[in-house]
Curated annotation (Swiss-Prot):
Matching Gene3D superfamilies: Diaminopimelate Epimerase, Chain A, domain 1 (3.10.310.10)
Native species: Methylocella silvestris (strain DSM 15510 / CIP 108128 / LMG 27833 / NCIMB 13906 / BL2)
PANTHER family assigned: DIAMINOPIMELATE EPIMERASE, DIAMINOPIMELATE EPIMERASE, CHLOROPLASTIC
Sites annotated Could be important to modulate the pK values of the two catalytic cysteine residues: H167, E216
GO terms, molecular function: diaminopimelate epimerase activity
The protein's name: Diaminopimelate epimerase
Compartments (UniProt record): Cytoplasm
Entry EC no(s): 5.1.1.7
Pfam families noted in UniProt: DAP_epimerase
Family: Belongs to the diaminopimelate epimerase family.
This protein's pathway: Amino-acid biosynthesis; L-lysine biosynthesis via DAP pathway; DL-2,6-diaminopimelate from LL-2,6-diaminopimelate: step 1/1
Active-site residues annotated for this sequence: C78, C225
Functional description taken from the UniProt entry: Catalyzes the stereoinversion of LL-2,6-diaminopimelate (L,L-DAP) to meso-diaminopimelate (meso-DAP), a precursor of L-lysine and an essential component of the bacterial peptidoglycan.
Quaternary structure and interacting proteins, as annotated: Homodimer.
Amino acid sequence: MNPLANRLAVKMNGIGNEILIVDLRGAGAGVTGPQARAIARTKGLAFDQLMVLEDPRSKGCAAFVTIFNADGSQSAACGNGTRCVAWTLLKDGARDEVLLETAAGRLACRRVSELVFSVEMGRPRLKAAEIPLSRDAPDTSAVDLSFGPADSPILKNPAVVNMGNPHAIFFVEDIGAYDLAAIGPVLEHDPLFPERANISLARIVSPERIELKVWERGVGLTLACGSAACAALVAAARRGLTGRRATVALPGGELDIFWRESDDMVVMTGPVAFEFETRLDPAIFADAAA
């Protein structure tokens, strides 16, 4: 029997980032890419990320979280989704902290208030091989990449950061001047990024505030992307455009991002919103290959 059939699904969002959570701990099975796509195509269940809770693999962790994008591809990190998972595990109020595992590593989550959570998103990986890039780049704070005519590029020299997944951040003066819906998919699939990349446009409002718009790998334009917000802060701080803490404003809302100097950890804090919960209709998976 399909372990997803009639399984409880919790629909939430993190500042507009649409999240669906399914708890498969104890089920002895996971989710496939085709199954994730089938859920994403179901009316009322469309998501940016599907967070699948599986049995923990390490002592002290509450769950291993496998993350799917709407196209069925997997992602190693989703900050907004991780905050939503933390809410589901901490909502009874018995404790204020929970430790999760993902493909990117362990993530410590903490309740700040009823609907606000912090997540330690890990340490940024900044070497070309860690992003990864298809060629060496001695300075990943500004790599050789452009979009547009060679003699007059529209965008050029992004910073690249891996925050569990690859990010390229272009700093611009006016985000609205660029058609990210057209630019994003081209740059996402640029040969420089063998695993594709999330593409962001960032504007420095002040040393304490960044405006951000994101084309998310495997999703498209999104109202919010937590790992992109973390990557933007790291990129801005490396260029001396901000300090190590700033508010990142996305179309869906704001996140507080802190790149802690003591241990190089990036901490993201922001709100979550519960929408509804439902049971997954077995008919959803009738045509989904294993």
